[in-house]
A protein has these predicted regions:
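Contiguous, often N-terminal, cationic amphipathic patches that form binding interfaces
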Residues: 1-58, 72-77, 83-103
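Short acidic capping loops at alpha-helix termini that bridge into adjacent secondary structure
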Residues: 68-70
């Protein structure tokens, strides 16, 4: 990643997660949380036809225990580095749920 410093961010209606996606993995998993706060995720789906983005939303919804409608990729739809908005979940709750699912 570049010199950007991503962290879990709190907002009025929820939080935002910086995510780095590796498609075509053997399974869906959270690999690690990088020093800059970016969540490294492996997905089994290919990046074609928006499949990886859909898989990411489905996977994060499962991990965070929220409906898919509460998640949105707000930046990075065509790249590996993404910013995902999580509505109605505070930063601390999101952080704890992600750490509980580290590979």
């Amino acid at each position: 990643m570049t010199d950007r410093q991503f962290k879990l961010h709190g907002g009025q209606r929820g939080s935002a997660l910086a995510v780095r996606v590796t498609p075509r993995a053997s399974r869906n998993e959270i690999v690690e949380v990088l020093d800059d706060g970016t969540i490294k995720v492996r997905l089994a789906t290919p990046p074609a036809d928006n499949e990886a983005n859909e898989a990411l939303i489905n996977f994060l919804a499962e991990i965070l225990g929220v409906p898919k409608s509460q998640l949105e990729i707000v930046a990075g739809e065509v790249g590996r580095d993404k910013l995902v908005s999580v509505v109605d979940m505070d930063v601390e709750t999101a952080h704890q749920r992600i750490l509980a699912h580290l590979g």
